Amino acid sequence: MNFNSSKYISHLPESLLPNDASPEWNNKADNAWQLTAATLVGLQTVPGLVILYGSMVKKKWAVNSAFMALYAFAAVLVCWVLWAHHMAFGTKLLPFVGKPNFALSQKFLLSKASTNYYLPMADFVFYQFAFAAITLVLLGGSLLGRMNFYAWMLFVPLWLTLSYTVGAFTIWGNGFLEGKIIDYAGGFVIHLSSGVAGFTAAYWVGPRTSNDRQNFPPNNIIHMLGGAGFLWMGWTGFNGGAPFQVGEITSLAIFNTHLCTATSILVWISLDMAVYKKGSLIGSVQGMMTGLVCITPGAGLVDPWAAILMGALSGSIPWYTMMVLHKKSPFFQSVDDTLGVFHTHAVAGILGGILSGVFAKPKLLRILYGPYGSGLLYSYFDDNIGQGIKQMWYQLLGAVFITIWNVVITSLICILLNRFVNLRMQEEDLEVGDDAAHGEEAYVLWGDGERMRLPLRRDISPIIPYISHQRHSFPINKIDE
């Protein structure tokens, strides 16, 4: 259709006519949905993961865990527009990364996003930032309860620059695997990379204190569920925004996302009840996460029946690796992955990537990408099994590349940082937690008989003047009413 033709423009309602604020190429529906989708993805992190992390950890780490997520979100946005966006989606510098450049000029941000997207570049930049930000925050889930916050402040921009941009450019940008791998919304780029990098960084940072490893109850399960709700509903924008247009792929992706997730939760709960004789709310949140992650690389490219099957597998295979294999394997036991990000994101991400290579429907691939390969299952029935095998080879190649790159680069970043700043907090601070790290605590009232803990950090506390150089708090008996 020729959208420049006066024949079509003359029949448009006045509200849809092009003007100075909305040029002819701008599809207002696509534009509005993309801004909504990007906002939903942002809400997955702030407040979603901020609440989830702050509630899922031991009480003494609530502030630090939430703060790590909030900092990463802010830092990634600044780095993204200053250099990282063009490294991920700009002009090719190397086969796996683009040239760093600003994404700040009005001319650039208000230009058409691409030949296939009828919306401003600003929408694309913001949506991709939200993807990058949540990747760093997911990675941080492996490091909660011991990483030095100053080291985290340096780790975030380094990992974004040296790792995330490479994965995004290689698979989604103009890299050597672009157009070959089926990764609809980030099963490899976001989830496999965050799971592998988080596990690797956890190795270099070292474990939590022995007491924290053995006794690490969530401080507020109900709040944790609220954060999980932001994640689940926010995935409507996560997978629904990936086509960058309002169409049938968007609708199918959203439907499949929630169908797979619900199936995964039910399977996880069933396994918990079969083995441990009772269901677990924390376990159901883990099952929710694995379902969301597994469907992500193929959300708009598979039929609903395949989404149900993917949900069944994402609720069982990561359950086995986390609840059985992790406890038996000396390898897994040697690395303290605080929230099990390796299982919920790396295992579920690679599972989803492989299953997307099996179940991707040729018609849906053509609608979204144009000329493309075919899933293994459909290539078998179409008498073109060679094409399906080739696609599976690319899926495996992508998984191997993302895994190796993240292990190597994350290790180098941690080794480099450790030469300038300690990766983990001092042992005495690890015993105290938030009060030592930030001079703040999550809850004023806590424990039997309810005790009030007042921070003694003089530059923050509005209640008492400077008393001691120690940044710890002391119990004050609650005044009898």
From Swiss-Prot:
Disruption phenotype: Normal arbuscular mycorrhizal (AM) symbiosis with AM fungi. Plants missing both PT4 and AMT2-3 fail to establish AM symbiosis with AM fungi in high nitrogen conditions, leading to premature arbuscule degeneration (PAD); these phenotypes are not suppressed in nitrogen-deprived conditions.
Expressing tissues: Mostly expressed in mycorrhizal roots. Also observed in the cortex and endodermis of non-mycorrhizal roots.
Glycosylation, residue list: 4
Keywords: Ammonia transport, Cell membrane, Glycoprotein, Membrane, Transmembrane, Transmembrane helix, Transport
UniProt KW Phosphoprotein keyword: no
Keyword set includes Transport: yes
Disulfide bonds listed in the record: none
Positions on the Extracellular side per record topology: 1-36, 84-123, 173-184, 242-248, 303-304, 360-363, 417-481
Subcellular location per the Swiss-Prot or TrEMBL entry: Cell membrane
Gene Ontology MF: a single term: ammonium channel activity
PROSITE patterns in the cross-refs: AMMONIUM_TRANSP
GO cellular component term, pick one: plasma membrane
Superkingdom of origin organism: Eukaryota
Function text: Involved in ammonium transport. Required for arbuscular mycorrhizal (AM) symbiosis with AM fungi (e.g. Glomus versiforme and G.intraradices) in low nitrogen conditions.
Family to which this protein belongs: Belongs to the ammonia transporter channel (TC 1.A.11.2) family.
Name of the protein in question: Ammonium transporter 2 member 3
Lineage: Eukaryota, Viridiplantae, Streptophyta, Embryophyta, Tracheophyta
